[in-house]
Amino acid sequence: MAQQLRVLQSLWAMERRLADEPEWPLQTQLTMIRDAGFDGAGVRFIDPVFATEVTSYLGAHGMIWQAQCYPKNVDELKPVLELVAKLGADHVNLQPDVRPYRIEDCIPLIEGWRRLGEQAGVAVHVETHRDRMTTDLFFTLHLLDLFPDLRLTADISHYLVGREFAWPVDEVNHGLIHRILDNSWGIHGRIASREQVQISPGFPQHQGWVELFMGWWEYAIRSWRKRAGPDAVLTFLCELGPPPYAITGSDGRELSDRWQDALVMKDMVRSLWQRIADEDGRETAPRVAI
């Protein structure tokens, strides 16, 4: 085997939140994800009944999943890991649902979560996320100072809009994002601008932001390929959220088709991965003497 990319779809992103139309049934959502060619899904593991139903479907169709959780303390990770032991998962995606003011207050939490993951033999990735321990870029960089080997899931949309990087993004800010990406073992996909956390990749006026994120994701993939084992799997979760993440017009309708945007993102990232893999293959291919 060789290193592989697996593109997943967020089930949260399948929510429509329309006032005059019902939500898609769960089985419809899962069938859409399968038929669209995704490799799996992001699954909330805080609800055992929900997680069991979803993973049963995904497993029956040869798909994978990440186990998502939102612990407020160390012990809240334990039932998630117990459920992972029963149902399996590629990894646990942990959103630390705490907002310490002091970096020192994070130490026992990070140490505890990592210890539990190691004891269970499960990879635990800490997500960079709004309104969590990792909500601020500089605070998260300080975490990396304390835990240089901390495994992150990179959702960098929050950092672009949170710090409102000047445009074009300068090398200093690129360097800060690159440091996050150098610790990332998974990616959550959403394209932001410096003022909006989620924009459609299809609008002409957004192409500069699309290119920015494709460049960051290229850096992330190349960094991961250097660090990961020869048979490792990188997951990329398409996570285009429903309103109010998605921008709506005066009629309450979204300005773009978010499902179609996710399909476009899936194909863009797979093409990016293939280009990088092809380039790496040419660089490592043995030279034939003439």
Model-assigned labels for residue ranges:
Residues 3-16, 41-43, 63-69, 92-94, ...:
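Hydrophobic faces of well-ordered beta-strands that scaffold small-molecule active sites
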Residues 13, 47, 71-73, 96-100, ...:
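Active-site-proximal loop/turn and secondary-structure-junction residues that shape catalytic pockets
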Residues 247-280:
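Short, low-complexity, polybasic intrinsically disordered segments
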Residues 10, 16-17, 161-164, 191-205, ...:
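Flexible glycine/acidic-rich beta-alpha junction loops that bind and position SAM and/or redox cofactors
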Residues 64-152:
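Active-site acidic/histidine proton-transfer and metal-coordination neighborhood
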Residues 119-204:
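Acidic/histidine-rich catalytic cores of soluble enzymes
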Residues 1-85, 89, 267-276, 280-290:
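N-terminal pre-domain/capping segments
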Residues 172-175, 209-233:
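A short, acidic, amphipathic alpha-helical segment used as a generic capping/interface helix at domain edges
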